[in-house]
Amino acid sequence: AGTGLDARDLHDEHALIWAHQEFTVIRNIVAQLGDRPGLGIEIGAHSTIGRTGVIGFMMLAGPTVREAIERAIPYLALSPTHLRFSLEEGTARGGFAYAVAADDEIPPDVRAFVVERDLAGLATAFQGAQIDLELTAIETTLGAESAELLAEAWGLESAAVVARCATNRLVIPRQRVDVRLPQADENTARLF
């Protein structure tokens, strides 16, 4: 209700669905099923890298995790995520890289659902594409219950996911971002 969408839009893979419409759909889902931790994670578990379109293709073609992420970031506005991603690196030798997923532009009433869905979806998509970041930790804006469920989605111990942080960060050993991806194709990567 109130989305401006009808059944034809939902079956048309070329239909344009705007962010405000998606947020209204999320509000309707939450109103119907209840605002409970893990609802977004359940939805994110159905993600695949193929559903991200050309961005997923760029991720698969990238020779390393770093290059795949750096190629995909400028095009994320074309993807189903509402998180703003960036890759940052610590200065300590042998330290960590951080895939930052800012959520400050998402309306507060749907933010937890979207963060859950998109971070769990990323975990599912990476697992399906055999991309192992070997995360050591996740810092998240989510509450404790959601953080624990997010740990499960990424295959981490509960203690490795810190709740109620200022932003969302996937903590990756720095050397992992330069590991060659199993499906890397340099000829395809040159196209991007």
For every predicted segment, state its role:
Residues A1-A97, E145-L149:
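N-terminal low-complexity or simple alpha-helical regulatory segments
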Residues R8, D103-D104, Q175-V177:
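A broad detector of the eukaryotic-type serine/threonine protein kinase catalytic domain
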Residues I26, I69, V115, L119-L122, ...:
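Hydrophobic alpha-helical core bundles mediating ligand binding, dimerization, or RNAP-core interactions
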Residues A45, V65, V115, L181, ...:
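Generic alpha-helical segment signature
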Residues M58, A112, D178-L181:
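Short, surface-exposed loop/turn motifs that are enriched in glycine and acidic residues
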Residues S79-E116, A123-A147:
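Conserved binding/catalytic microenvironments
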Residues E152-F192:
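Extended mid-to-C-terminal alpha-helical interaction segments
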